[in-house]
A protein has these predicted regions:
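Bacterial N-terminal signal peptides that target proteins for export
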Residues: 3-16
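N-terminal signal peptide c-region/cleavage motif recognized by signal peptidases
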Residues: 24-28
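N-terminal (or domain-start) structured segment
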Residues: 29-118, 157, 165, 181-210, ...
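Hinge/capping helix and adjacent helix->loop/strand transition within the periplasmic-binding protein
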Residues: 87-93, 108-194, 243, 256-289
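A ligand-binding cleft/hinge motif common to bilobed small-molecule-binding domains
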Residues: 102-111, 170, 177-179, 206-240, ...
């Protein structure tokens, strides 16, 4: 266990102690104190993180009786928007919805203007977004063991695509390389769309990607999904095995979106938000909307999310470090 993980755990214990203290105090009961509320999404409009955030904003606004406005502040892989929230007042008026990229920043960027744990108050994990191991239908493999054997039988001739260097799909493939004991060329693209196009055309032989981008192609028979990266099978592709079931017992990764507030936001406000979302996000209507973008609802407690973020930072950081992926 690394010294960074131990330091993160010490900060986590302090944060959880604050959450429990304020929760016991009963402060901020009743009306939510901020109106309107800005929900910052550090990516352009229309993407899966943005769509999930807008669903959360709508439900949160209705539950709290306030206006929740989504603002897209993209740049530097999401760090521009995250930095805005890190610098905001912890009064409930500014929130952040970010993907698992939030905990990858320290591993792939040499300079990060905030601490991904200590500069924020964790509120809840909103959703998980399973990644699928995809191959073109023309590739003569039907499962993960056959893919591994194909790679070994064709040294230097198998390449994997990603939506960009350092993202969750890229690092998922790097973990696959390590666990399977194979070497594959990385071909990064500017987004999932061109990568999936080349994958379907056979220009690259495999790709890990979120179901947000790839589910429609799998269901249309244009791509084969050999496995999902989550510990359990996905309800969206129930017949597709997990990586563990497919023969890699140590492999488990989840892409996810979470909700944060600036550091120091009182725990009763945090709990008010979490409870409001928990009451709405598991309804059949919201689940259907999330499934349409390849996501599954979670809504964890602030304490559980705080622990989850620490372990995810360690997990993704280790994968990034092993792969040598950097962006500046």
């Amino acid at each position: 266990m690394s010294q960074y993980f131990n330091a993160d755990m010490r900060r986590l214990r302090r944060a959880c102690a604050g959450i429990l203290f304020f929760a016991a105090s009963g402060a901020w009961a009743g009306q939510y104190p901020a109106n309107p509320v800005r929900m910052i999404v550090p990516y352009p409009p229309g993407g899966p993180t943005d769509i999930a955030a807008r669903l959360a904003a709508d439900e949160l606004g209705r539950s709290l009786g306030v206006s929740v406005v989504v603002e897209n502040k993209s740049g530097a892989g999401g760090m521009v928007g995250a930095d805005m929230v890190a610098r905001a007042r912890p009064d409930g008026a500014t929130l952040l919805v970010n993907a698992s990229a939030h905990v990858i920043y320290p591993a792939i960027f040499k300079q990060v203007s905030f601490d991904v744990i200590d500069s924020f108050t964790p509120v809840t994990q909103l959703v998980q977004v399973p990644l699928a191991l995809l191959v073109p239908v023309s590739l003569p493999v039907n499962n993960v063991p056959e893919l591994i054997q194909y790679i070994k039988d064709h040294p230097g001739k198998v390449a994997f695509a990603s939506a960009g260097n350092g993202g969750a799909p890229h690092l998922a493939a790097e973990l696959f390389k390590k666990e399977a004991g194979v070497d594959i060329l990385h071909v990064p693209y500017k987004g999932s769309a061109p990568a999936l196009t080349d994958l379907m055309g056979g220009q690259v032989q495999m790709m890990f990607d979120s179901m947000t981008s790839s589910l429609a192609y799998v269901k249309a028979g244009k791509l084969n999904a050999l496995a999902v990266t989550t510990p359990e099978r996905s309800s969206m592709l129930p017949d597709v095995p997990t990586m563990k079931e497919a023969g890699l017992p140590s492999y488990a990764l989840t892409n996810w979106y979470g909700l944060w507030a600036p550091k120091g936001m009182p725990a009763p406000l945090v709990k008010q938000i979490e409870q409001a979302l928990n009451a709405k996000f598991h309804t059949p209507e919201i689940r259907e909307k999330l499934n349409a973008i390849g996501a599954e609802p979670v809504i964890s407690s602030p304490e559980d999310f705080a622990r989850f973020v620490v372990t995810e930072k360690e997990r993704w950081g280790r994968i990034a470090q092993d792969s040598g992926a950097t962006l500046n």
